[in-house]
Swiss-Prot record:
It comes from the Eukaryota. Cooperates with the reticulon proteins and tubule-shaping DP1 family proteins to generate and maintain the structure of the tubular endoplasmic reticulum network. Has GTPase activity, which is required for its function in ER organization. Residues 784-786 are lumenal. It comes from Penicillium rubens (strain ATCC 28089 / DSM 1075 / NRRL 1951 / Wisconsin 54-1255) (Penicillium chrysogenum). GO terms for cellular component: endoplasmic reticulum membrane. Belongs to the TRAFAC class dynamin-like GTPase superfamily. GB1/RHD3 GTPase family. RHD3 subfamily. Residues 66-320 form the GB1/RHD3-type G domain. This is Protein sey1.
Length: 880
């Protein structure tokens, strides 16, 4: 019987004046645990959801049940005994209709826990934690044509419940409205949209038709056949989404049918059958031998695993509220999404909780690593691996314990998300640790090798570079592997140091190769300096000896001394011998570096190119215009001033100065074209520089070539031929050099000519006759006197010998020099005497006035004298 509710001041504004299920906890009612003893209102008639649903579940000890609970809903027409049926099946105390008033009793949706647990020792007992929802009936006069709540409540029941009990009377079978076919059609249409949201899982529900007032006249099988046919036709008429046109109702729903006797006419049978029906609400399994399409249904437990919505009990309240919010706001209901939202809500909460502990364990390491990277000094963190492994295991295990009961897909996704977050941070730490170990290892390796090399050099320069590299490489690898293995995290796919170890080995090899190249560069530099020193000496000697008759250049070809024709052959042979010796030195030393054949080839190739550059630079140094002109003059003077025996010539008027000059000049001029091009005498062609240097090795890097000067005939891209590379003097330089040499040679010739003319005394012929006439007596006196005669004879012999030895010129020059020196010495002594005596000082003062007057005349005289001398010199040159 319905009771009157409290006054308006005491009840909720949304509560009706007549109390329905007044002994239940309704929405807006406040009370203690006793008010939830019989159940709770989930949704009121105004479509308001009860936020205290979770409180009721906690009081009934359902919240910690996890998945060990079941939800049943009942719907059907109003006043058909739905609440009565639930009370008999589950021992609940839902309010029932007053038979005297025939009005609506259940308003909204109410929920109660199963009060019938059955015998614990019985083989057949009801399942634990059965939650029963009593849904407001349809087709009531109170709602009239407003079927909105009917559809929403039915959809809510279908979306949340495993089993939907459809309560109908036997005489309503075959009817459309009486059998709630219109409502089922709407539910089916919307439900198809729900199933489309999750194509990986087909959610099934059980529609349990309880046929009331079953008298048995029409067999139950015929009734269920009629209902199935109606449901199938109803299914065929609904609009199906794309891809589900050929689907059947059995793809989404299972069906059970049970007939109950008339409660008023057969009360005992009704109670008995209701008890039997109640025992059906237990866990069961699908019987593969029964075909639902043929009307064969299992009579065992109705709670099949596929019916469960897999919503943990502690999240059901939040899930149901979300479902109702979707329904009441006329949004497309998406059950998988709602389940995912619930799971996401709970998993997010759990995730945040477990991440707090993770942060406490890891953040300090992250900060320290970030700081070391910021300052540019990566540091290997001690104890990182232990902390990472412990934090990961604890975090993932805690999340699994709390969140694994929720929607599998969401749990897996959130678990993957958590694992992703954890692994992302741990992976960053892991790679940061390996990066620090990598960088510090490379740095330490390079420093250790350099230190060992320097130590070896200090001890005497004898060290095995390859042995040093191998030792330090092994040490670096052991340190890196120790750090990497101590940082590995079990179970993490990214926790693998194989790639990093491979990269570390690769970079060690690259650094080793770079250090080896640097060491070989230093070796090459030392060898190049040695080549430069050797070539500088030997080539300098050849150029110094160029064309010197005394040194052999001007000697005949069949003589013991080399000729000028094979000058470049000697230079090239010296060059080849020197470089070959340098290559042996380089190869022998490079073998201790464990250098590859390719590296040695590159080193030798560079050495040959560098050596040619040294030779070319030395030749250019020797061939500087001033140096070359001096060498040509020396060459000319050696041939002009000295005879074939190397004796200096004393020019006499009778000597063939012009012939000797011409031969010496022409011989020297032949040296200029010889020196202008580097050609071998034996082949009359430039040396095979391109073959001697060889092709660029395939392993040569741009760094190996960047400091090399281009060589004509070898580097084709330079556009310079071998002939151009071997050209030492251009045509213009040759012509200029020839002109300048001829001028210098002419000067030497003029000097020689003057020397010959200056030694000749011009005595008139009549002087000899006058001398004979006037000195006849003296001549006879000398001839008759033996002493005079002997003295004259000795003087004549001395003069003859002097003449034959061509010593008159030197003797005259010596005499002139001695007399000049005596004159200068006399002038000096006279000046000292005049300055030291009074008489001398007075004489100097008297001559000072006269000197000023005569200065003009003196300058005029000196200028005239200079012009006269210049005119005489030009006349002498014209005469020669």
């Amino acid at each position: 019987m319905a009771e009157r509710r409290p006054s308006g001041l005491e009840r909720s504004p949304t509560a009706p004046p007549v109390l329905s299920n007044g002994h239940f906890a309704s929405i807006g009612a406040e009370g203690d645990a006793s008010s939830y003893e019989h159940g709770v209102q989930v949704i009121d008639e105004n479509k308001e959801f009860n936020p205290d649903l979770s409180k009721y579940l906690s009081l009934e000890n359902v919240t910690p049940a996890g998945f060990n609970y079941h939800l049943i809903s009942v719907f059907g027409s109003q006043s058909t005994g739905k609440s009565t049926l639930l009370n008999h099946l589950f021992g609940t105390q839902f309010s029932v209709m007053s038979e005297l008033e025939r009005r609506q009793t259940t308003k909204g949706i109410w929920l109660s826990n199963n009060k019938k647990q059955g015998d614990a020792g019985s083989a057949e007992r009801m399942a634990d934690n059965i939650l029963v929802m009593d849904v407001e009936g349809t087709d009531g006069r109170e709602r009239g044509e407003d079927q909105d709540f009917e559809r929403k409540s039915a959809l809510f029941a279908l979306a949340t419940s495993e089993v939907l009990i459809v309560n109908i009377w036997e005489h309503q079978v075959g009817l459309y409205q009486g059998a709630n076919m219109g409502l089922l059609k709407t539910v089916f249409e919307v439900n198809l949209q729900l199933f489309l949201k999750d194509k990986h899982t087909t959610h099934r529900s059980l529609l349990f038709f309880v046929i009331r007032d079953f008298i048995g006249t029409t067999p139950l099988k015929n009734l269920q056949k009629t209902l199935l046919e109606d449901l199938s036709r109803l299914w065929d008429t609904i609009s199906k989404p794309a891809g589900l046109e050929k689907s059947t109702i059995h793809d989404y729903f299972d069906f059970q049918f049970y007939g109950l006797p008339h409660k008023g006419y057969q009360p005992d049978q009704f109670v008995t059958e209701a008890n039997k029906l109640g025992l059906r609400f237990r866990e069961g399994h699908r019987d593969p031998k029964r075909d639902a399409l043929k009307g064969e249904f299992s009579e065992g437990g109705v709670f099949l695993p596929e019916y469960h919505r897999r919503i943990p009990a502690d999240g059901f309240s939040h899930y149901a509220e979300g479902i109702w919010d979707q329904i009441v706001n006329n949004k497309d209901l998406d059950l998988p999404t709602q389940q995912e939202l619930l799971a996401q809500f709970r998993c997010d909460e759990i995730l945040r909780e477990v991440m707090i502990g993770f942060d406490e364990a890891i953040t300090a390491f992250e900060d320290k690593q970030a700081e070391s990277v910021r300052v540019g000094a990566p540091e290997v963190l001690g104890g990182l691996g232990v902390a990472m492994r412990a934090a990961r295991v604890k975090t993932l295990k805690s999340f699994e314990t709390e969140a694994s009961r929720y929607h599998k897909g969401v749990y897996q996704r959130k678990s993957a998300e958590l694992q992703g977050k954890v692994d992302t941070r741990l992976k960053a730490l892991f790679h940061g640790q390996l990066s620090a170990a990598h960088k510090s290892g490379i740095r330490d390796f390079s420093d250790s090798v350099s230190a060992a090399v320097k130590d070896g050099q200090k001890k005497g320069g004898s060290y095995d570079f390859a042995e040093i590299v191998a030792k330090e490489t092994q040490s670096s690898l052991e340190k890196f592997e120790e750090v990497a293995h101590s940082t590995l995290v079990d179970g993490a796919s990214w926790s693998n140091c194989t790639q990093e170890l491979s990269l570390f080995k690769k970079e060690l090899a690259e650094v080793s190769a770079r250090l080896r190249r640097d060491e070989m560069r230093r070796l090459a530099t030392r060898v190049e300096r040695w080549v430069q020193s050797r070539l500088g000496e030997s080539v300098g000697l050849e150029f110094n000896a160029l064309g010197s008759g005394r040194a052999g250049g001007g000697a005949p070809e069949n003589g013991e001394k080399p000729t000028e024709k094979d000058f470049w052959d000697r230079i090239w042979n010296l060059f080849e011998e020197t470089v070959l010796d340098a290559e042996r030195r380089f190869t022998d030393r490079a073998s201790s570096f464990d250098a590859s054949i390719d590296e040695v080839d590159v080193g030798l190739w560079r050495l040959r190119r560098k050596s040619w550059g040294v030779l070319r630079a030395k030749i250019e140094e020797e061939m500087i215009e001033g140096n070359l002109l001096l060498k040509l003059r020396e060459n000319f003077e050696d041939k002009f001033r000295y005879d074939e025996a190397g004796v200096p010539r004393i020019w006499r008027p009778t000597d063939d100065i012009e012939g000797i000059y011409t031969r010496a000049r022409e011989s020297t001029l032949t040296v200029i074209p010889l020196l202008s091009r580097f050609r071998l005498e034996r082949t009359t062609a430039p040396p095979p520089l391109d073959r001697w240097i060889g092709h660029t090795p395939s392993t040569a890097t741009p760094a190996d070539e960047e400091d090399l000067a281009p060589i004509g005939g070898v580097d084709e891209h330079e556009g310079k031929s071998l002939e151009e590379e071997m050209t030492i003097l251009s045509d213009a330089k040759r012509q200029e050099l020839t002109v300048r040499f001829k001028k210098a040679a002419d000067g030497v010739y003029v000097e020689a000519k003057r020397s010959a003319i200056g030694g000749m005394t011009q005595v008139p012929l009549y002087f000899y006759g006058l001398l004979l006439a006037l000195g006849w007596n003296e001549i006879w006196a000398v001839l008759r006197n033996p002493a005079y005669f002997i003295l004259l004879f000795a003087f004549a012999i001395g003069a003859y010998i002097t003449y034959q030895l061509n010593l008159w010129g030197p003797m005259l020059k010596m005499t002139e020099a001695a007399s000049q020196q005596a004159l200068e010495e006399g002038k000096r002594r006279l000046r000292e005497f005049l300055e030291s005596s009074d008489t001398g000082r007075q004489a100097i003062a008297m001559s000072a006035g006269e000197r000023a007057g005569s200065s003009g005349r003196k300058e005029e005289y000196e200028m005239s004298d200079m012009q006269k001398r210049a005119s005489n010199a030009n006349d002498d040159l014209d005469d020669m």
